Amino acid sequence: MADNDFEGFGIFEEPEGFRPSTPPPKEVLHTRVIVPNGPEEIKLRLVGSHSLWAHYLWNSGIELANYIDKNPDTVRAKKVLELGAGAGLPSIVSAFDGAKFVVSTDYPDPALIDNLEHNVKQYAEIASKISAVGYLWGSNIKEVMSNAGFKDNEVFDILLLSDLVFNHTEHSKLIKSCKMAIEGNPNAVVYVFFTHHRPHLAKKDMIFFDIAQSEGFQIEKILEEKRTPMFEEDPGAPEIRATVHGYKMTIPIPV
C-alpha cells in the first residue's frame, strides 16, 4: 500500500463527539450571611470539571466562610493557611475579615491553581495579602512559608480545612501538614469542617480525629448546620448528607 493510501481517512483523528469535551468554567455567587467588611456577594469561578471535585462549591466551605464572617476575630490579624482550598471561598472571606495574610493552597495541578489564583486575586483590596500556591499534603511546608515571606521561626496561626476528611488515605498526611504549619504556636487553631457524604463511611471519616488526637491535638466540636445534600440522588440518609460538622483542633502547651 502506498504512503498516501490512508489519505482522507483520518485514522488518527477522533470523530467529532467521540470524546466529550471538558465543560467550561462556571461562575457562582456566594451571598454572605454577615458582612464585617468587603462585598455582600463573592464571585467565584469553578473549574469546568476535575477529578478532585474542585468543580463544586461545597457546603462545608460555605459554612466555614459563614463561621468566619460571624466570628471575624477568628482570623483578624492572623496568618491563615487553607488546605485543599478548591475555589478559595474561606480564604477570600478571611482576607476581607482582616487576616494579616492568607495562603490558599490546593493540589499542585495547573488548572486548579490557575483557577484559585483567578479567584483570590480578583478583588484589588485584598490581592496584596492573599496568594494561591500548589501544595501536596504531607510534603515539607517550609517552601510555602518561605514564599509567604515567613522568617525562620514563624508559623501559621489559623488553618482552614473544609470537606477533606472524606479522603481517608490522606488523613495522616493532612495531620502532618497541620502540625508542620503551626509547630510551636500554642495559640494556633485548626478548623475542620466536613459532611459525611457517604454515611456508610462516616466512621472512617472520623478516624481523622483519632489520628489527630494521637498526634497531640485536642478536639472540640463547634458547629452543626443543616443544608441541602450536595447530591440528592446519592445513597444514604439525606439528613446525614445534608449536615455540616465543624471542629477546632489545638495543641496545648505541655505542662
Curated annotation (Swiss-Prot):
Per the UniProt entry, the Enzyme Commission number(s) are 2.1.1.-
> Which domain of life does the UniProt lineage start with?
Eukaryota
Name of this protein: Protein N-terminal and lysine N-methyltransferase efm7
Read off the PANTHER family from this record.
HEPATOCELLULAR CARCINOMA-ASSOCIATED ANTIGEN, PROTEIN N-TERMINAL AND LYSINE N-METHYLTRANSFERASE EFM7
Identify the Gene3D superfamilies for this entry.
Vaccinia Virus protein VP39 (3.40.50.150)
Q: List positions binding S-adenosyl-L-methionine.
A: 58, 84-86, 106, 137, 162
Q: Which GO terms describe its biological process?
A: methylation; nicotinamide metabolic process
Q: What does this protein do?
A: S-adenosyl-L-methionine-dependent protein methyltransferase that trimethylates the N-terminal glycine 'Gly-2' of elongation factor 1-alpha, before also catalyzing the mono- and dimethylation of 'Lys-3'.
Give the enzyme's main class according to its UniProt record, as a single word: transferase
Q: Where is this region: Disordered?
A: 1-25
- Could you tell me the keywords of this UniProt record? Cytoplasm, Methyltransferase, S-adenosyl-L-methionine, Transferase
Give a yes or no for keyword Cell membrane in this entry: no
Record flagged with keyword Nucleus: no
A molecular function (GO) term: protein methyltransferase activity
Similarity comment: family membership? Belongs to the class I-like SAM-binding methyltransferase superfamily. EFM7 family.
State where the protein is found. Answer: Cytoplasm
A cellular-component GO term for this protein: cytosol
